[in-house]
């Protein structure tokens, strides 16, 4: 299930584009997630009241959380699958405190791919998309395994 060196390079190349503007990428990913899967909003007390896309775009809190999410994910992706230390606290908080189901991690993975396709069509062709999907699946599978260890059936 691991990625080849070439696949990791494709992932990290496009991730460099994300890091050049994390706030707008993070905001777009969360808006895409909430629009595509409104039920996910219920897990976010500070965003539940945001009903329209305009309200979401105007929310500094949402933008800030998008930065947090993509910064954490970037740290994990840069470990090229050797992300045990980074994953453990994330799985702990998402399983025990936030109670985020694995399905929602799938939804946000789809949102990330969607936003990258939209914002970077020239740098995110079929090979890069395949590599990113594989990297995000590896992340989700490892999160699910940690959830299981923690007794969370998310």
From Swiss-Prot:
Quaternary organization: Monomeric.
Catalytic activity of the protein: Fe(III)-heme b-[protein] + nitric oxide + H2O = Fe(II)-heme b-[protein] + nitrite + 2 H(+); H2O2 + AH2 = A + 2 H2O
Entry EC number(s): 1.7.-.-, 1.11.1.-
Amino-acid positions noted as binding nitrite in the UniProt annotation, renumbered to this chain: 65
Protein role: Monomeric heme protein which primary function is to store oxygen and facilitate its diffusion within muscle tissues. Reversibly binds oxygen through a pentacoordinated heme iron and enables its timely and efficient release as needed during periods of heightened demand. Depending on the oxidative conditions of tissues and cells, and in addition to its ability to bind oxygen, it also has a nitrite reductase activity whereby it regulates the production of bioactive nitric oxide.
Domain Globin as annotated: residue spans: 2-148
Enzyme class: oxidoreductase
Binding site for O2: 65
Domain of life: Eukaryota
GO molecular function: heme binding; metal ion binding; nitrite reductase activity; oxygen binding; oxygen carrier activity; peroxidase activity
Family: Belongs to the globin family.
SUPFAM superfamilies linked: Globin-like
Subcellular location as annotated: Cytoplasm, Sarcoplasm
Keywords: Cytoplasm, Heme, Iron, Metal-binding, Muscle protein, Oxidoreductase, Oxygen transport, Phosphoprotein, Transport
Any GO BP: removal of superoxide radicals
Pfam family membership, one: Globin
Phosphothreonine, modified sites: 68
Residues that bear Phosphoserine: 4
A GO-annotated cellular component: sarcoplasm
Binding site for heme b: 94
Further facts: Marmoset, woolly monkey, and squirrel monkey have a minor myoglobin component that appears to differ from each major component in having Phe-Lys preceding position 2.
Name of the protein described by the UniProt record: Myoglobin
